[in-house]
A protein has these predicted regions:
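Conserved small-residue-rich beta-alpha loop and adjacent elements
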Residues: 1-68, 72, 135
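Flexible, charged surface loops at secondary-structure boundaries
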Residues: 12-14, 88-91
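Conserved residues at the C-terminal ends of beta-strands
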Residues: 22, 80, 99, 178
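Short glycine-rich anion-binding loops that position phosphate/pyrophosphate groups of nucleotides
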Residues: 25-26, 100-103, 133
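Short acidic loop-to-helix transition motifs that present clustered carboxylates
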Residues: 28, 78-83, 103
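Alpha-helical segments flanking ligand/cofactor-binding loops in enzyme cores
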Residues: 37, 85-86
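ALDH superfamily catalytic-core signature
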Residues: 45, 65-69, 73, 83, ...
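Conserved phosphate-coordination/catalytic loops
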Residues: 56, 78, 148-152
Length: 246
């Protein structure tokens, strides 16, 4: 089968070796999928360190993976960045996988942003990363768009932005529209209207409030706030629950 062939080709390189999985902070399922891939597709033994925002997953992982824990091929741990650093640099660990931002990747591999002063990476083990990006949402300029289609796609985009308080790796971040598209203004107006109507969750992710503030400061009058601003009480509650940028 296709799965069998994947197991043959993948496990020969990594099979039986230890991989550290640094869990995602924005979605529960990502860490689970990463562990399953490394265990059953790549043939690795896995140590997963959960993101500080999602340490609640630890107890569930202990139950779900109990048979593999008893076999000695899986472990679930919690801790801060220091714990993560000790794990990835441990001599028994052969590879690393993480879901996070480029700053986290560079901190692990280079000890910070790569520069001419530090041409050699601190971590030379194989590492795979799923990093966030500025995901574009591209509109094809076609005169045949109907009002119904404009509304449908504007709401699709608005819901993608609102989902998970926009704290997803692939959340659309940039809308690309042809400057001469005759429906451009109508689409943007419909999108703004949809965003005003969708209830927004509290942006819980560490540091997101500061990023929003910097964005607004950078663009000045060109930045438009749509919907209600986060109340001071809600912002303080999010900061208390999840702390500053981790």
């Amino acid at each position: 089968t296709q799965g069998g062939e994947a197991l043959k080709t993948s496990s020969t390189a990594d099979g039986g070796r230890v991989c550290v999985v640094l869990g995602a902070g924005n979605q529960d399922f990502l860490t689970l999928v990463d562990c399953i891939d490394k265990l059953f597709v790549r043939g690795c033994a896995v140590i997963v360190k959960h993101h500080p925002v999602r340490q609640h997953q630890h107890e569930h992982f202990l139950r779900c993976f109990e048979p593999l824990i008893e076999l000695g091929v899986f472990a679930s741990v919690v801790g801060d960045a220091e714990v993560g650093a000790k794990l990835v640099h441990h001599e028994s660990v052969a590879s690393v996988h993480l879901t996070g931002g480029v700053a986290t990747h560079d901190a692990i591999v280079w000890g910070g942003a790569p520069s001419a002063a530090a041409p050699q990476p601190m971590l030379t083990k194989p590492i795979t990363s799923e990093l966030g990006c500025v995901t574009p949402y591209i509109i094809t300029p076609d005169a045949a768009w109907t009002t119904k289609q404009l509304t449908h796609h504007a709401w699709q985009l608005a819901n993608a932005c609102a989902a998970q308080a926009h704290c997803n790796c692939l959340s659309p971040q940039a809308l690309l529209i042809a400057g001469d598209w005759e429906h451009a203004d109508a689409f943007v107006a419909t999108l703004k209207d949809a965003l005003r109507q969708i209830p927004m969750a509290v942006p819980y992710y560490p540091g997101v409030q500061k990023r929003h503030a910097k964005f607004a400061e950078h663009y000045g009058d060109r930045a438009e706030r749509i919907g209600e601003a986060l109340s001071p009480g809600a912002a303080a509650d999010a900061a208390e629950r999840f702390g500053e940028a981790l």
